[in-house]
Amino acid sequence: KKLDEAVYLGGIDNETDISGQIDLMNQAMEQGADGILLAPADSNSLADSCQKVREKDIPVVLIDSSINSSEFDACYMTDNIDAGEMAAKEMLEMLYDAGNSPTDPLEVGIQLSSDTSQAMVNRVSGFLNFWAGNAPEQWEIVQDIRVNGGDTKKAQSDASALLRENADIKGFFGCNNTSTVGIVNTLFEEERTDVVLVGFDLADETKQMLQNPEYHGVTVLQKQDQMGYLGMLSLNSLIKGEKSEQKYFDTGVIMVDSDYLMENAVS
């Protein structure tokens, strides 16, 4: 509204529907889009689509995640390596606060929805790097990192399986909303108040866990509204012929726990 521009919104029902997102990109080109704002579902597959769009002199602004090429004009997203490191730091603090001893065996399970999403891969990388340099020697990451394909039910069954197969699990890192919700559902269903959760994003299920004093949880809240808002402003400028030398813009994150929820209105 602020820019007085016509915006046509299209999306896929499941983040694994990569071909569907490619089809939407092709439709946008065919229908004469002046610019495209894209949250890529796959960092590899969408690279070719972005290249085809830019070959037609149509600017592309990415939000939420980047692609594995330079074929875009700007990208507004979380610094996901930094966010992963923050998540690992928070995990260690919460594990200590929950009474876990650094000399006792302990494991942390990890889930993500896609191992071809640059954003999620970077979150895991940041988490593992911080963990390797700061966790006690007896505390380990479960090597079986689960990929749930954006399916909440699979995320829940994967979390349950990890608990069943790894008796020393005392923590979970959910790298995105789907993974976090699946883990939350498992912890509630199995009443695992002894397991710490560090998640991403803030679904109703996650908020319910954070508000329950019997459970130990925190979530990394991305600023999606800023990604979309700043991305649209940038796209409008590019359509008008303005250029920017900077391509990546970190929109930041907020660590949300029960205290933060009480003190702030988080939508």
What residue ranges belong to the model's regions?
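Glycine-centered short loops/turns at secondary-structure junctions
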Residues: 2-4, 32, 57
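Hydrophobic alpha-helical
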Residues: 25-55, 126-127, 143-208
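Hydrophobic alpha-helical segments within soluble ligand-binding/sensing domains
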Residues: 21, 76-105, 122, 153-156, ...
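Hinge/cleft segment of the Venus flytrap/periplasmic-binding protein
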Residues: 105-115, 119, 130-131, 202, ...
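Short, solvent-exposed amphipathic alpha-helices that sit
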Residues: 1-4, 83-90, 118-138, 154, ...
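Flexible loop/hinge segments that line or gate small-molecule binding clefts
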Residues: 44-82, 86, 98-107, 203-212, ...
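Short beta-strand elements in bilobed, periplasmic/extracellular small-molecule ligand-binding domains
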Residues: 2-14, 107-110, 128, 132-152
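Short beta-strand segments enriched in small/hydrophobic residues
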Residues: 1, 8-10, 35, 40, ...
